[in-house]
Amino acid sequence: MSSRSLKWDVKFINLACYHSTWSKDQSTKVGAVIVGNSNEILSTGYNGFPRGVNEAKTPKWYYKWVGGLAPTMVPICQKEQEELRKRWERPMKYLYTEHAERNAIYNAARVGAKLEGSTLYMNFYPLPCADCARAVIQAGISCIIGPDRTFP
């Protein structure tokens, strides 16, 4: 039985706004909160690069397959550094950035949280892209709450 109300919706939208501030993307900050039927927080997420990827720096070294069974740490030449730097800029960053909704779903999976029948709150309009919408459906999330077009 869901105990959703406008009061709780506003609280969870505000929490999604707070989590969006953790994103290092200066132009698009999105936060997501997944909540169970008793208003318990199951997971949170924000848009950003995958776990463990340093968004602030271009690495000078990286793992590369140079033969054999395991990757080897090798230096990156100037051309490769430039290619990696482009990943942090538009439009390339979109290929590497994980959306807040999917990050929240992945974070729930990491700790074994069941999302069946849960509600996803996010601070971004329009609501999920097609890829995120598929993930939301597959995760069993039954409701998405977000701001209307006039939300600040």
Where are these regions (language model features)?
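Zinc-dependent deaminase catalytic domain
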Residues: 1-152
